Amino acid sequence: MFCGLNDVNVCTISLQMAMWRPNESKVYLPPTPVSKVLSTDVYVTRTNVYYHGGSSRLLTVGHPYYSIKKSGNNKVSVPKVSGYQYRVFHVKLPDPNKFGLPDANLYDPDTQRLLWACVGVEVGRGQPLGVGISGHPYYNKQDDTENSHNPDAADDGREYISMDYKQTQLFILGCKPPIGEHWSKGTTCSGSSAVGDCPPLQFTNTTIEDGDMVETGFGALDFAALQSNKSDVPLDICTNICKYPDYLKMAADPYGDSMFFSLRREQMFTRHFFNRGGSMGDALPDELYVKSSTVQTPGSYVYTSTPSGSMVSSEQQLFNKPYWLRRAQGHNNGMCWGNRIFLTVVDTTRSTNVSLCATVTTETNYKASNYKEYLRHMEEYDLQFIFQLCKITLTPEIMAYIHNMDARLLEDWNFGVPPPPSASLQDTYRYLQSQAITCQKPTPPKTPTDPYATMTFWDVDLSESFSMDLDQFPLGRKFLLQRGATPTVSRKRAAATAAAPTAKRKKVRR
């Protein structure tokens, strides 16, 4: 529509026909719903009752490189105890439902159950600071590549080499054992490999047990399967698996049982630079160098280094100090399911290996063959905990949730799920060993009550070491101090003795 030219106000109105187009945007369906994991704070009620639990002085002594076996029966006479091993303590707690509680009305045993929550921990470490040395009498070191050196064509260029490892301090607390990761030998496809080919690598998750070797600076590998010459790494790991905690998997655990919280401090630098002796498995590409007329083949270009953890200091210690658990990284906020917790410790700052000497023959003059030298390593621990008493009301919804999480918990609380009723009549023979009847089926093996019975841990039983007198223990006093509570000492006032009444004198008038 148009307005006249003589009009004062001129306006133009244009109309556009609507045009339909198909919807070109993608339609996204909602994701598949997943079961929601509840935090323990939702269905667990904390009380104001606290207990202290502590171990005795824990000591271990052994050889730092390998186990020593007797020649006769092949029995281990001296175990392997190294400062570069994991110490996984399996701490067993008393059942609070069988505990003598100060208040009988604290919970209802018909509908509720008691459990422990760890709220404080302190790992005490004895022994002085020191650096442990490891090595190999036949270490695969061909040349010192840090300095100029002509390639050595010897068939056996192994030498005596020793070194100190990467410095590690590690601390993991949970109600399940920690999960470790390492690279192992994978499986090759049929017909795709030949003798001498590089083995395929496979990422592997395993449970970290007590005595497993930590990652020392040579990688988290299965050295027994991936290094057949047994000389690429020192003696204490050349036939072992070095594991590294899988922090990613433990942090992604829906329940968070393997790691309530963790502390770690790692430190390393490279000290020496070597190359490996042997034939080169991967050919060096021609475009990476100009060929020489004097040297037909280049030297070994498989370079390696020796690690070093550098200086140890008391100012950088993670141990001998308390830690308080307010909020765990996962949904399990410190609940000790199954009345157990696992404490994983690594401390390479106290890895000193001591030398012991014994005399073979007595002579006046010194002769090296007259003495036998031995090597030992010692460790000392002291574990202290603060536990809070908690209660859980077992409603049908909570029981179903716990059954999906861990069915053994309800069985331990005498809330087992009854089996379905059987409509058929069962046959039971009297004499099972009699040859007059048909052969009976073997009895199925009983499932072990302890799911960790086949694993190796350092068992610490605290069943008889709980106490409510927190002010009588160092960690308990620290706990009371950070809560702002002071220990009270009740003193009874001495009973006042009744004084004998004084007889009044009669006034006598004179």
From Swiss-Prot:
Keyword list, A-Z: Capsid protein, Disulfide bond, Host nucleus, Host-virus interaction, Late protein, T=7 icosahedral capsid protein, Viral attachment to host cell, Viral penetration into host cytoplasm, Virion, Virus endocytosis by host, Virus entry into host cell
InterPro entries tied to this protein: Capsid_L1_Papillomavir, Capsid_L1_sf_Papillomavir, dsDNA_vir_gr_I_capsid
Subcellular location field: Virion; Host nucleus
One function term, GO molecular function aspect: structural molecule activity
Transmembrane segments: none
GO BP terms: endocytosis involved in viral entry into host cell; virion attachment to host cell
Region Disordered: start-end pairs: 490-510
Pfam families: Late_protein_L1 (PF00500)
Any one Gene Ontology cellular component term annotated for this protein: T=7 icosahedral viral capsid
Family: Belongs to the papillomaviridae L1 protein family.
Function, in words: Forms an icosahedral capsid with a T=7 symmetry and a 50 nm diameter. The capsid is composed of 72 pentamers linked to each other by disulfide bonds and associated with L2 proteins. Binds to heparan sulfate proteoglycans on cell surface of basal layer keratinocytes to provide initial virion attachment. This binding mediates a conformational change in the virus capsid that facilitates efficient infection. The virion enters the host cell via endocytosis. During virus trafficking, L1 protein dissociates from the viral DNA and the genomic DNA is released to the host nucleus.
Quaternary assembly: Self-assembles into homopentamers. The capsid has an icosahedral symmetry and consists of 72 capsomers, with each capsomer being a pentamer of L1. Interacts with the minor capsid protein L2; this interaction is necessary for viral genome encapsidation. Interacts with protein E2; this interaction enhances E2-dependent replication and transcription activation.
Protein name: Major capsid protein L1
Species of provenance: Human papillomavirus 57
Lineage summary: Viruses, Monodnaviria, Shotokuvirae, Cossaviricota, Papovaviricetes
